[in-house]
A protein has these predicted regions:
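Cell-envelope/extracellular polymer assembly enzymes that use nucleotide-activated donors
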Residues: 7-9, 38, 176
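A conserved acidic beta->alpha catalytic loop
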Residues: 17, 27, 43-52, 69
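Short, acidic, metal-binding catalytic loop of nucleotide-sugar glycosyltransferases
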Residues: 26-36
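Conserved donor nucleotide-binding strand/loop of the catalytic core
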Residues: 37-41, 51-82
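Short aromatic/hydrophobic "clamp" motif used to bind/position activated sugar donors
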Residues: 88
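Conserved donor NDP-sugar-binding/catalytic core segment of glycosyltransferases
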Residues: 99-128
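Catalytic donor/gating beta->alpha subdomain of glycosyltransferases that bind UDP-sugars
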Residues: 109, 123-126, 133, 168-226
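Terminal low-complexity segments of carbohydrate-biosynthetic enzymes
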Residues: 198-199, 211-275
Length: 275
């Protein structure tokens, strides 16, 4: 069976993301056209008319699962229960994909060359203010080089799904899932890219970074003995680097305060453009 005819499911959890879906769902429809793929949108305690947005997208024909209670792990589990194919992708609701993406990513899974695949992530700083734009440039360069950037759009074959197992209720679900797969069975496809938007304000950046810090600490606490974080050397314009490092420092006390008040997983609104 060729990669273009491999059946697969694309699970997209979303909570009140109608604005983002108006941009990303048509792109997903185009990327799925002519493939063996099916989109499964799990609407997670959604009240903003997202289902209507999805049903109005020409050619998408999604399976829509609506959940009354929030929780990303439960949303992902609902998507897994609705899936019927051995090859499965997980796509963030604000990520833009292009035609040919899924065929390229399905190939190593179908051929048994990998159990977990990911596309390279391209970061758009369009619409960001000057300082957040500087931070976004450094972040984008990091994501373009990191060997552990299994996020935004990931794909699993049958063995990968078994090795990963059911989703836990953790903040850093992407990192947890990646760590369940042996490094030799992971593959980032350097010539396949997806696009995401960088946070547009300094406050958004601090919120995003604080959530990442909480997620990393939670994994170390719940799963001791896991692999150490991968460090990718910083590079870029000195002013860009200064802005990036300032945001990192500012996020540390914010993350501690959030932990003190019991903050858990939440939708990252900073990268969900509304216009």
């Amino acid at each position: 069976m060729s990669a273009s005819t491999v059946p697969f499911d694309v699970v997209v959890p979303a909570r009140n993301e109608a604005a983002a879906l108006r941009r990303t769902a048509p792109a997903l429809a185009a990327a799925l056209c002519g493939t063996g793929g099916r989109a499964i949108y799990v609407l997670n305690a959604t009240t903003d008319g997202s289902a209507g947005v999805l049903r109005a997208v020409p050619g998408l024909e999604p399976l829509i699962v609506e959940r009354a209670s929030p929780g990303k792990a439960r949303a992902l589990a609902s998507g897994d229960r609705a899936a019927r194919s051995g090859v499965r992708f997980y796509l963030d609701a604000d990520v833009r994909v292009a035609p040919g993406t899924f065929e390229a990513m399905a190939a190593p899974l179908a051929q048994g060359r990998a159990d977990l695949v990911a596309a390279r992530i391209r970061v758009s700083v369009d619409g960001a203010r000057p300082v957040p734009r500087r931070v976004g440039r450094i972040w984008g360069d990091q994501l373009a080089r990191r060997p552990d950037a299994f996020m935004a759009l990931t794909g699993y074959g049958p063995d990968g799904l078994r090795a990963r197992g059911p989703w836990p209720g953790v903040i850093a679900d992407d990192d947890w899932a990646r760590n369940r797969i042996a490094p030799s069975r992971r593959l980032i496809l350097e010539d396949v890219t997806v696009e995401i938007d960088a946070p547009r304000t300094v406050a958004d950046w601090i919120a995003v970074r604080a959530r990442w810090l909480r997620g990393s600490r939670e994994l170390r606490r719940l799963f001791p003995g896991g692999p150490p974080p991968v460090r990718t050397a910083l590079r870029g314009d000195p002013l860009d680097l200064a802005a990036y490092l300032a945001v990192r420092l500012a996020a540390v006390p914010v993350s501690r305060l959030q932990e003190a008040f019991g903050a858990g997983w939440s939708v990252d609104r900073s990268t969900r453009r509304t216009g």
